[in-house]
Amino acid sequence: MKVTSLDGRRLRKMLRKEAEARCVVLDCRPYLAFAASSVRGSLNVNLNSVVLRRARGGAVSARYVLADEAARARLLQEGGGGVAAVVVLDQGSRHWQKLREESAARVVLTSLLACLSAGPRVYFLKGGYETFYSQYPECCVDAKPISQEKLEGERGLLSQCGKPILSVAYRPAYDQGGPVEILPFLYLGSAYHASKCEFLANLHITALLNVSRRTSEACTTHLHYKWIPVEDSHTADISSHFQEAIDFIDCVREEGGKVLVHCEAGVSRSPTICMAYLMKTKQFRLKEAFEYIKQRRSVVSPNFGFMGQLLQYESEILPSTPTPQPPSCQGEAASSTFIGHLQTLSPDMQGAYCTFPTSVLAPVPTHATVAELHRSPVATATSC
């Protein structure tokens, strides 16, 4: 069995001809994007970073790929339980052969080929959800439908970029509304917001800072534009770009302009840059910076790796504050400092990134015998 590529037109026919009973669509995008807008009847495959890291592009258990027990049992039946096709999609990839090894779509495809030796054919949707939803919005569902009156008004508009505005009834949550003001000269939004010239003109935006994998040419001819390519991955190094981004924002501010910082969804990478800017220039603590931005753009959710880098950045640029009750032992402190700090944050902030493996939270056992301690007369920890 092999993976076959298909376009949106063919998927649309399959959904109509086969109905949902004969075609299973597996959406490998993050749950936030899936919950906001998805192919009708599709299932979300939400593989966490630990599973992806261990898989390294290889196969994982079917229970990770198909969390829905009924769907899993049916597909694993002899002959696929009557299912003729399993379609895998991500946000916008055009070729499954070029998928990154650590991508969820790559792991899902490999796993399906391993567990479905016979039965349903495995397909990959070219162009991903972005292309399909722009072509066939009637085959998709959105969590936040917009009133018919507003929809009819939007349909009659043309953007200043010369392209028709897509039906906003199927726009993901992170693209709803417009860019938000973080500071009088600093705005935060998504790639969609950055592509809409009317948004930029209304807010008097003079510069764009793109922190995503792909550069953009839309509406950039008359704007000061900077592109910092960063993956939205817990292993990506974003902190090395903090100063570069801060310098660019300050340059725009000094010239009396306004800058829109964006990535793909305006959820992880660009909010991380904005938090770093607040921490550096306003001396905000990480908790303060996160809550400040969360109040203005509720969908922000930096990944766990970015939060760790922001925490490290805080320790480098801001004076340390004494903790009221330090850990009782140095070994305990070494294993729990980072997690303990995050657990003191607000509930919203704790839920904003991936769940850390619970094994890290467990105390580290000490197997070696403890020799007599020769304590310094100057600094003696009485709690150990």
Swiss-Prot record:
Origin organism is Rattus norvegicus (Rat)
Name under which the protein is recorded: Dual specificity protein phosphatase 5
Which Gene Ontology cellular component terms are annotated?
cytoplasm; nucleus
GO MF annotations in UniProt: MAP kinase tyrosine/serine/threonine phosphatase activity; phosphatase activity; phosphoprotein phosphatase activity; protein serine/threonine phosphatase activity; protein tyrosine phosphatase activity; protein tyrosine/serine/threonine phosphatase activity
Name the Pfam families on file: DSPc, Rhodanese
Q: What is its EC number?
A: 3.1.3.16, 3.1.3.48
Domain Tyrosine-protein phosphatase residue range list = 178-319
- What are the leading ranks of the lineage? Eukaryota, Metazoa, Chordata, Craniata, Vertebrata
Question: What's in the keyword line of the UniProt record?
Answer: Hydrolase, Nucleus, Protein phosphatase
